[in-house]
Every structure is written in structure tokens, then in C-alpha cells.
UniProtKB/Swiss-Prot annotation:
Main location: nucleus
Example GO biological process: DNA-templated DNA replication
Name of the gene this protein is made from: IPI3
Cellular compartments annotated: Nucleus
The name this protein goes by in its record: Pre-rRNA-processing protein IPI3
Keywords associated with the record: Nucleus, Repeat, Ribosome biogenesis, rRNA processing, WD repeat
Amino acid sequence: MDESVFYISEGDPADKHSQESFGHSSSVHSSQQHAGFRQADCPQNGACLSGVGTGERLFVASPNKALINVYSWGKESPDQRIPIPEQLSCLTLCKHPRIKVSEGRQSDERNLPSFRTPWLLAGGSKTGKIYVWELASGNLLCVKEAHYQAITAIKFSQCGTFLVSGSSDARCMVWRTSDLISVYNKDEESSINIKPFASFTDHSLPITDLAISEAGIISDLRLYTVSRDSTLRIYDIMTKSLLTTFVLPSGIECVTKDPANRACYVGLSNGLIRTVPLYQINPNTSVLESIGGRGKIVTLDTDPNLLSTFVHHQQRLSTEPLHKTLNKKTTTEEKPILVTRLSITMDGSNLISGDSAGRVYVSDIVSRQVVKTFAPCKSSISYIQVNACAAEKVSVSNTSSNNNDKRHRLIPQFKRVLANPDPLEHQLYMEIPKQQEDEEDFESWLARKSQEELEFRNLTHINSSVTVTGAAPTTNDSTVKELEEKLAKVSKAYTDLRGKHEELYEEHNRLLSDS
């Protein structure tokens, strides 16, 4: 098992060298580079990767054109340049919902078709509109004027129930996915007049980033939003309420959260990364308690001892790039370094961060020290994504399947007008993989049959199988032996008593007959 980090830069139209940008995918725990993508640059949050390995795709919004570039994993140049109605500023993907087919049987993610796509692609534009496409058909399912200014961040919840958008107008909107894709409803009026599930207007400056908790229960969904007004706000999506507001000493550019929801990590506009703990130990009761709640405002002071601060992004490079030196661009020395993107590994032990200078670091969260440095980009980092993957899945030799017929790699072109509401016109292009037969040995087959027989006999959903635990087998054997000896003695005494009774009864009958 390995973890792959994908990062991409923003690009600078004024600098011709920065246009020779690359998107990189490298290993966190080794020096292996998994993939590279040429001419890949995008605005902040303007890219999304469906996964790691053969058959996966990268979607990149062009920073200065109304195009979406689509890359296939293992291929450096873009496969498709898809025109869209207007220029997009951010992208996000929604995967297909997982449906449980049968009881006790789960789908095998290793048995994937060579042609596969996620379910939905959503994008936010600079005019404040939300676009939603279905990737398997290319249909445009939704065009919604959601904000007054440019949308800066857009994300689906892990379950796909909600779509959250943040904008420069300082508003954050939560939409139901089912409402946005209701183009096939018979009621056209309801599909046009879509209202947000929740609207949060507590920020006073543009929202720069947001994160959604990966909760197994929908009632536990939490929304984390950050803004240049130096606040981190935590909302409960289902109750539509503000839980906690954290005030930091500087503007916030990005946010990520711990996988176990123990803390948040925010990148500041002064080049620092602050840890925001969500739990603390009460010194009086020694009990772990949550911080904030019920709309409480928590102010985080400066950290002079650097107990919860990462400072490695404030260190400038000793030598500037050669092309900047030749062009005599000395103004870059005076610009402050911003932490633009943050992500975290699967176990929550390493923090991946990118800044406006194009540097990407892997830091240990406990020691707050840099453990690895990736190849730098020539402009600001605009997107970082961490994916867990198998080592053989991302090997270079495994990309030979990309040389198949090009028709099998291309996805349908995106429509520029809304889809036909007639469900009969809804056509999908999908590849159904061959059903993989399960291989089981004779012992597992016997165990499964015995369990089925037990359930059949019980005729109930309660499993009445009993597992004996407790005393050792030697103690049980001695107890049984002692009870057997007592039973033998009682049986012998009863036999003797019965014999005496029969002798006395015969003597009694003999005396009666003589008299």
C-alpha cells in the first residue's frame, strides 16, 4: 500500500516559462514518481483527479479559456479539450453511489472496467454559476445562478447527498444533489426554481476554501469554511447551525482536517500553518472535551513558542529560478509567501502543503518538521490531492493498457444546453465488467454451509451459536470426573437399599403365611 500525492500549479500568463507547467503525481513514502501531465495549469481548486491507476482521469479547468482538459492516467498530453459555455474557476467530482446488491457480499473494487468515469462533474464559474454534467452521457443537468461573484470552492460530500459552494461574495451555499439533477422531473417549474438546502452568510470577506467531514452518518456532517477575514467556521449541515468560530491572527487561504476529526490545519497568508485543535483535556476533570459549540467564538493567539505552528514555508529559496533572474523580476522578493493548498495523509500523520512559490512539502505533524520535498513548480500551487493506492496499481509498466483504441478512452463531449427532460432520450455509455467468480476452498465452503443450516433451523434473525469462554479445559474435566464418582456412589447405595427392602418384604410375607 502506498499513498500518491498529485499537485498542480496555477500558471502565470505573463511568464512564458511558467506556461510550461506540469502536474505531478509522486509517492509520499518513496522517491517514485507515478505520473506527469504536460501543459497542466488551473486556477485555485480548478482540478480534480478521479483516482490513481490505469483507467483513471484528470480534469483540469483552463485558467484563461472556456475549456476543460481531460487527461488519462499514464499519458502526459491531454486526451481531450472539451469546450464549455464559460470559463470555470473550480471543479469537483461525485462518484457513483455504492449499492449493496446482496446480503453479506461486497463489490470487488479490483474488478474495474477499462472504461469508467465518475458520476457527476460540477464546476463553478467566475460569474457565480454552478454547472453539473453527467460524465457517462455528457448531458448538462444543471445551470444555476448561485452566487453574485466568482465561485472559489466547490465540493461534494462523500456520500454525494450535498454539494457545497463558496464564493467571493462571502456566502456559502449547501445544495441537495437530487435537486440539482432534477432535469428529468415532470414538474419543470420545480426543476428551475431550485432553492439551496442551507445558506451561511457569517463571513465578511471572500471564502477561500472549504472542507466536509467524512461522516458515516449523514446527521454528523460538518462543514469547515475559511475566509480572508481570518476566521474558521464550523457548521452542522443537517441542523443548519453555526457550531464554532475560530479567529486567527492572519487571513486564511486553505484548510484541511484530520481524518478522525481531531483537529484542523489552516494555511495563512503570512506563510504559516496553524493547528486548530477541536478537543482538549480539561485540567480539572482530566476528561477529553470538545472545544467550542453552540456558536462559541474561540480566539487563537499568536504562537511564539511554535507549539502548533509550521514555519517552513516562510523560508525563502536561496537561489531564484534562472529565468526570473534574467528577466530581472526583483518584485518577487518582496511578495509575501502564502500557503495556498493543504492536504493530509490517510493515517493523519503527515501534512502535505503547497505555497505561492511553487514548493510542496511533506511535514510530520507531531514534530512539525519537513520529511520530504517534491519537485517544485514555477508558479503558485493551485490543487493538491492525496490518494491511497496499491503499489502495483501505479507502476510504470502497468500503463501499457493505455495504448488501446483511443475510442475507448474518450468520454462524451459536454453539452452546452440543458438535457432533454424526456427520460427516453437519456443514453449512457458504460462498460460492464465480467463477473468475477469467487474462489473458496473446501473448509470455507463447509463453514458457510453450516452457518446456513444454523440460520435455517433457527428460522429467525438471531444467531444462537454459543461460544464457551471462561474456565480452562482441565478444570472442566476434573469437575465432570468428581460428579461421575458421586453419581456412582449414590447409585450403589440405592441398589443396596433396594436389595435390603426386598429381603425384608419376603420375610414379612413368610411370617404372615406361617401364622
